[in-house]
Amino acid sequence: LYKCVPHHLHRYPAEEDRYALFLRQASRVACNIASVVDLSAPLRFAELRRRGVRKALSAGVSVEESEAWADFWGVLKDNLSHRFGAHPVHTLDEITRLHALFPGNIRLFTATLDGRVEGGTVVYECGDCVRVQYISASERGKECAVLDLLFDYLLRDRYASRRYFDFGTSNGDDGHFLNEGLI
């Protein structure tokens, strides 16, 4: 099996790998869709998201880079378990070990309210591209739209000078299931 490198991760646009697969008469067994924002031509936030940003600000939500991995992992595990009967691909120990090995490339950003982590995401930095994984909020965080404020900060401030912001894939079952809520 081979997974093609997404176009936005190439330093120079190229598809030699796809051509080699064609020559070998390879067949596709899966197809995923990635949601990527070109920050040199950003999309306008939907009105619902802009209202969410205002709601989070008026509630007193703050956003920051954080070392509160255990607090966020608790929010993430609860959310995945209750909504999907699933668990994170990485354990808390694994993700903190990866962060310790690559502190300039793997970061945690959290949204807090009254001193409690109510949401967050893990960010992977690689050249001109930023990719997020493990986007999650508690029930209270969802009520206060903490993720709208978090992504407003990440897209418009923290990573505005990067080229691409990759939200990851929105599929399951090798591409046969599309989670439209992630698009």
Whereabouts are the PLM-identified features?
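A structural signal for short secondary-structure junctions
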Residues: 124-126, 158-165, 178-180
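Conserved acetyl-CoA-binding loop-helix of GNAT-fold acetyltransferases
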Residues: 1, 142-156
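Residue-level marker for well-ordered alpha-helical positions
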Residues: 15, 50, 148, 152, ...
